């Protein structure tokens, strides 16, 4: 694989783009070493695309948000390229259009991390912070990255509702919030009330595949946000 062949020629950390990046609470360090497979994949991407972000993607949004959106992981040409969750790929188009419709955005989304877009009342994060091969993190990688999700959710003092995009995000978020999976099965539109903490709402992931196949439609996705607003 081209990524694997190039990984030994990655630029050293001090030559990477965004050398002054400093992670905030709940974000992974730029050269996080916890998952060897993801580190190797990340290094290969740095060698092939030295101007891309190619690092754990930090959360994005309002630090006083009442709504959090938990995705799966960065896409190779989306967040892994731009350094902002859901920015630069198909899933971001639907997500940010929906956030805008429901009044969560300031500025205009233009698929770039420097487009001036802001979020008001909402925050976006991922279950896994690094881009995984074939968009499929392993169970061990999901578990290893979960402490960052736990810490990120704890940094949001006004959090009332979390929307989980897809089954993996659902499972990791349930565990991050201290819930038990058998009591909280995934299903689009399912609402999960845990003993403490925010309410969790499930949604199919807003991926190109799900929208092209009709598994997720725009009205279905918007209904999830309507439910979130009703639970605020």
Question: Can you describe what each PLM-predicted range is?
Answer:
Residues 3-232:
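A polyanion-binding, active-site-adjacent surface
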